[in-house]
């Protein structure tokens, strides 16, 4: 059996190395490691790139998921014990973000072609406790957001997208 090598990001990142090291030195010399000017610049640039009014940088995916789900709970859209459909092959951070605010993850098998949450299998998991779908975009490929939006609208549940691995990806509209 032939071994398939895991993708080596070091090769992809090599062209950014000098700039990365220069900026790390600059931050290290400033003594400001939390918030500060660099975070403000990053948030502004990312908001502009995403054509969004706002951007809030967080330390990791667990924090991002936790803040998102907490906001829905504060708004009254979610409550303790509500179920969130999530891809079975997602990273643990998705699950920790859900469980850390007393919500229940319900695993949905991935689509074998895209490895994203399977829109057909989602239908079998939705019940009266289901209040949200967490679409986790994997390997640079967005989930089928058109189908997921239709399902969420029809079932009157929330759709949350974790696009950390697909930032900048485009979805065909025709």
Region locations from a protein language model:
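Generic structural signal for small/hydrophobic residues in well-ordered secondary structure
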Residues: 8, 24, 46, 64, ...
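Conserved coil-to-alpha-helix start sites within the AMP-binding
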Residues: 89-95
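Active-site phosphate-binding strand-loop segment of PLP-dependent enzymes
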Residues: 113-174
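Structured catalytic cores of enzymes that bind and process phosphorylated ligands/cofactors
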Residues: 8, 54-57, 99, 108, ...
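N-terminal "arm"/small-domain region of PLP-dependent enzymes with the aminotransferase-like
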Residues: 1-32, 37
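PLP-dependent aminotransferase class I/II
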Residues: 10, 22, 39-45, 49-55, ...
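Phosphate-binding glycine-rich loop
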Residues: 32, 36-83, 97-101, 107
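Short beta-strand->loop structural element characteristic of the AMP-binding/adenylate-forming
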Residues: 104-114
């Amino acid at each position: 059996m032939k071994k398939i090598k895991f993708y080596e990001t070091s090769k992809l990142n090599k062209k950014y190395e000098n700039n990365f090291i220069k900026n790390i030195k600059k931050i290290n010399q400033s003594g400001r490691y939390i918030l500060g000017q660099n975070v403000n610049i990053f948030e502004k640039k990312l908001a502009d790139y995403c054509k969004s009014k706002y951007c809030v940088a967080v330390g990791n995916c667990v924090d991002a998921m936790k803040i998102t789900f907490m906001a829905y709970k504060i708004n009254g859209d979610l409550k303790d014990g509500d179920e969130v459909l999530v891809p079975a092959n997602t990273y643990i951070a998705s699950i920790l973000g859900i469980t850390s605010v007393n919500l229940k993850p319900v695993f949905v098998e991935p689509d074998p072609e895209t490895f994203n949450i399977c829109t057909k299998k989602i239908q079998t998991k939705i019940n009266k406790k289901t209040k949200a779908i967490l679409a986790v975009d994997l390997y640079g490929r967005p989930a089928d957001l058109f189908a997921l939006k239709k399902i969420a609208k029809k079932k009157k549940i929330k759709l949350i997208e974790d696009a950390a691995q697909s930032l900048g990806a485009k979805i065909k509209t025709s």
